[in-house]
Amino acid sequence: MARYFRRRKFCRFTAEGVQEIDYKDIATLKNYITESGKIVPSRITGTRAKYQRQLRRAIKRARYLSLLPYTDRHQ
């Protein structure tokens, strides 16, 4: 039987040496929200707690300033 090994999760922000997550960096923030607009949890992405809090704050600020949508497009 073949075993499938999951790739080890790692924090991208720690690896890149990011100090602060910016709410104006929409390209990065879009990687951490689902198609329906929900914030992806850290157990899925592997983000450390410190950066998950910064990510949450940045996404909420970007939503408030209409840089990111709160939900997906309704049809």
Curated annotation (Swiss-Prot):
The family this protein is said to belong to: Belongs to the bacterial ribosomal protein bS18 family.
HAMAP family assigned: Ribosomal_bS18
Name of the protein: Small ribosomal subunit protein bS18
InterPro entries according to UniProt: Ribosomal_bS18 (IPR001648), Ribosomal_bS18_CS (IPR018275), Ribosomal_bS18_sf (IPR036870)
GO MF terms, alphabetically ordered: small ribosomal subunit rRNA binding; structural constituent of ribosome
Example GO BP: translation
Role according to the record: Binds as a heterodimer with protein bS6 to the central domain of the 16S rRNA, where it helps stabilize the platform of the 30S subunit.
PTM-bearing positions, type N-acetylalanine: 2
One Gene Ontology cellular component: cytosolic small ribosomal subunit
Alphabetically ordered keywords of this record: Acetylation, Ribonucleoprotein, Ribosomal protein, RNA-binding, rRNA-binding
Subunit and partners: Part of the 30S ribosomal subunit. Forms a tight heterodimer with protein bS6.
